Curated annotation (Swiss-Prot):
Entry keyword set: DNA-binding, Methyltransferase, Restriction system, S-adenosyl-L-methionine, Transferase
Additional remark text: The MboI restriction system has two different methylases.
Keyword DNA-binding: yes
Family that this chain belongs to: Belongs to the N(4)/N(6)-methyltransferase family.
Protein name as annotated: Type II methyltransferase M2.MboI
Length: 273
């Protein structure tokens, strides 16, 4: 039985579903997804404080980001990653972003589920939040693990394009990309929103036109918006109504004129599209 999306574009290339990704992924067809990008909860919401935009703010993102039980976090990651593997095509790949709070558990779970880790990308942010406590080095990066489903089945990688985007030099595993720009938040924002430049580079490097991309933690829909700009097909899963509505607004924002404007801005971030 086909599950009805919360929102489906007229061309059926942009679909978002409301619900828990673990529940929903079991309803999708196995071996049908070309690439998965996932930005799972980092579980950072511990009532601490941070310094952002010259204002002291709470680090709390929402109830979905609260969990201080290591066993529970491990089981959560194991369950959704195992289901994600079922959905990937045999030559498919998965990208998972995180910080030191969750990325080591994610890497371990990937290996336990027989993924082959290809790279660990360091996303360096040129303008990180100030070091509020002054008790350790300033956090200025996040990591993104890239892995493929099978150790011996080749994956797709657009090496030539990545080299072209890097001034005809091999693209390294340290990416210096800016955080989300104000032009990406005109319809609203998500507390852990990723920049379109980051997702565009990921999509361009590991997928081809008309490929099917899944984001099980869709948030504000950045993966899907980047997919629309780059002529890919998208499935997103998100629990929170406010972010589903935000994703819809962002999708409807992309008129032909604005699509070209967005691509020009992304081009400045990653050199060329």
């Amino acid at each position: 039985m086909r599950i009805k999306p919360y929102f489906e574009s007229d061309d059926k290339n942009f679909n978002i579903y409301q619900g828990n990704c673990i529940d929903f992924m079991s309803h999708f067809q196995d071996n049908s997804i070309d690439m998965i990008f996932a930005d799972p909860p980092y579980f950072l919401s511990n009532d601490g404080l941070t310094f952002k935009n010259s204002i002291i703010q709470s680090v709390n993102k929402g109830e979905w980001d609260k969990n201080d039980n290591e066993a529970s976090i491990y089981n959560f990651n194991h369950e959704w990653i195992a289901q994600a593997r079922q959905l990937l095509k045999d030559n498919g790949t998965i990208w998972i972003s995180g910080t030191h709070h969750n990325i080591f558990t994610v890497g371990q779970v990937l290996k336990e589920n027989n993924f082959k880790i290809l790279n660990i990308i360091t996303w360096e942010k040129p303008n990180p939040p100030p070091n509020f406590s002054c008790r350790y080095f300033t956090y200025s990066s996040e990591w993104i693990i890239w892995a493929r489903k099978h150790s011996k089945i080749p994956h797709y990688f657009n090496y030539d394009l990545m080299k072209k985007l890097n001034g005809d030099k091999q693209q390294k595993d340290i990416w210096r990309l800016p955080a989300v720009g104000s032009w990406e938040k005109t319809q609203g924002k998500h507390p852990t929103q990723k920049p379109l430049g980051l997702l565009s580079r990921i999509i361009l490097s590991s997928t081809q036109k008309d490929d099917l991309i899944l984001d099980p933690f869709s948030g504000s829909g950045t993966t899907g918006i980047a997919g629309v700009l780059l002529d890919r097909n998208y499935i997103g899963i998100e629990q929170e109504l406010e972010f589903l509505e935000l994703s819809k607004r962002r999708y409807h924002e992309i008129t032909p004129v604005l699509k070209n404007e967005f691509k020009q801005k992304i081009r400045k971030q990653i050199s060329a599209i």
